[in-house]
UniProtKB/Swiss-Prot annotation:
Record keywords: Ribonucleoprotein, Ribosomal protein, RNA-binding, rRNA-binding
Organism: Wigglesworthia glossinidia brevipalpis
InterPro entries from the UniProt entry: Ribosomal_uS19 (IPR002222), Ribosomal_uS19_bac-type (IPR005732), Ribosomal_uS19_CS (IPR020934), Ribosomal_uS19_SF (IPR023575)
Hydrolase among keywords: no
Gene that encodes the chain: rpsS
Protein's name in the database: Small ribosomal subunit protein uS19
Length: 92
């Protein structure tokens, strides 16, 4: 179920504070975050944010088509290694 419109989009305060600091200084700095639940705002466009997938931080470059989505949508948490191969040998 989507979030109520009267509540507005969610972003963690510590992440918002880091984004505002980088916007003021104008530096290109990588932001590391564990907040996969935060919504991508238009202020984040052009930044690189490193999002934790449970094992390591994966950097993602924020584009304009990502606005409104969550950070966790772009970093998969599970790796698919494929199904086990069929090991039967055919006899001729």
């Amino acid at each position: 179920m989507p979030r109520s419109l009267k509540k507005g989009p969610f972003i963690d305060f510590h992440l918002l504070k880091k984004i505002e600091e980088i916007k003021q200084t104008g530096k290109k700095k990588l932001i590391r975050t564990w907040s996969r639940r935060s919504t991508i705002f238009p202020d984040m466009i052009g930044m690189t944010i490193s999002v934790h997938n449970g094992k390591q931080h994966i950097p993602i470059f924020i584009g304009d088509e990502m606005v409104g989505h969550k950070l966790g949508e772009f970093v998969p948490t599970r790796t698919y290694r494929g199904h086990s191969a069929d090991k039967k040998i055919k006899k001729r």
